[in-house]
Amino acid sequence: MSLSNKTVKELRQLLKERYTVEDELTESIALSSMRFKPSQEPEFHALSQSSLLKTKLKQQSSTDIPSYTHVLISKLSCEKITHYAVRGGNIEIMGILMGFTLKDNIVVMDCFNLPVVGTETRVNAQLESYEYMVQYIDEMYNHNDGGDGRDYKGAKLNVVGWFHSHPGYDCWLSNIDIQTQDLNQRFQDPYVAIVVDPLKSLEDKILRMGAFRTIESKSDDNSATSYYELETIIFDSELNRALFETKLNLHCVIEDDESEQISLNRLIDSMKQYSYLMDSKNVRTRIKLATTSERVSNENKKNIDYQNRSTRSQFCLNTQRGDSTETSSFGSMFSGDNTSDVDMEDRNLTEFDSTDTSLCINGEPSIHVNRVERSSRSTDNFHNSKKRMNSNQEKCHDEGNDMLQRNVLETDYARAKNRILASKIKQYERLRFYKDTFTL
């Protein structure tokens, strides 16, 4: 496959048709394709970062405790929160929100995550997390020393809430979340809790995020703590808007060198496993051939022994029949018939008077021996047939396992190979685009 003669459009089409759908390369944690829910109220259409900061500087302090109904959060904070949550995967993450308040609005300008111990359903902030939070805020947002603190046009950012993730089970507050939020509201209000669901956000391509505060619901007997949801409004900087309107329509994919190395390691591992599988199959085949040859040799020996025994038995039977005939001839000669012209008067019968003989006159014992041998032969044939049947079943079972393992390894090999090729083609496509764009 030659790529030198292909255009950038053809390269993108090649990636889309051959690699993107099969290898699911579109499932990236980049938020460029994620849609943000716009506000439906006219007063927030022209909302921007600079207008919020100007309003904050003009705002006069008030002793009245407002009832917060809106959360204004920057797009930068949304991307950082979603990025932290997606990196956490099925494990919950936690962080701090930085911003200020405007009347009944809580404005979130920035955020940062905390080093916490999380599970799939719970996240706990230890003492080290609070120490990290204090040091981070002092280094990044403290303007007293005139150092490298982040400048938001004179507006000082404070802690206005916290955020955590609910991977896969939507945005709401659990009982522990309600207790945590209520405790923070009592001692450092204004304070808001933001919950994000990274799994559903990636699945639906829409940011799943909710902002909540607690409220005491008083009844006749006791007072219980509940929560309500605030309307979330996302704003952006004018600089980002201008960049978004004038930027090239190019989808920049975040390249990960580790993913390419992982794919290469998987490719090599699949090749090693396939080679080991073939070697094991060859060894088993040689062992089976040697076993089969030995079994055939033993069967041939048994057949030869059986034929020899049958021959000896038949010879013994024929010999017995011949001796019986000769004995009858001797009896006829010693009978009272004197028609013979041979003078047999002086015969000596002492050697023939005995009725006992060492020869087997009756043929039944030989027949019994033949029957036993035939029965033994039938049993051997049955066992040999059973062994051959079991051997065939084991052979079919081994062939099925080998085929299954071979298919799995071939699939893994093809997938890893496609990922590596897709990564290389992407790199070439990007370089080709730069060359065509900036070459006169």
Swiss-Prot record:
Its EC number is 3.4.-.-. CDD domains: MPN_RPN11_CSN5. It comes from the Eukaryota. GO terms for molecular function: metal ion binding; metallopeptidase activity. Residues 319-341 have a biased composition (Polar residues). Residues 71-218 form the MPN domain. Coiled coil: none annotated. Pfam families: JAB. InterPro entries: JAMM/MPN+_dom (IPR000555), JAMM_MPN+_peptidase_M67A (IPR050242), MPN (IPR037518). It is found in: Cytoplasm; Nucleus. Its cofactor is a divalent metal cation. GO terms for biological process: proteolysis. Residues 319-343, 376-400 are annotated as: Disordered. Component of a COP9 signalosome-like (CSN) complex, composed of at least RRI1/CSN5, CSN9, RRI2/CSN10, PCI8/CSN11, CSN12 and CSI1. Within this complex it probably interacts directly with CSN12. Also interacts with RPN5. Catalytic component of the COP9 signalosome (CSN) complex that acts as an regulator of the ubiquitin (Ubl) conjugation pathway by mediating the deneddylation of the cullin subunit of SCF-type E3 ubiquitin-protein ligase complexes. The CSN complex is involved in the regulation of the mating pheromone response. The JAMM motif is essential for the protease activity of the CSN complex resulting in deneddylation of cullins. It constitutes the catalytic center of the complex. Belongs to the peptidase M67A family. CSN5 subfamily. This is COP9 signalosome complex subunit 5.
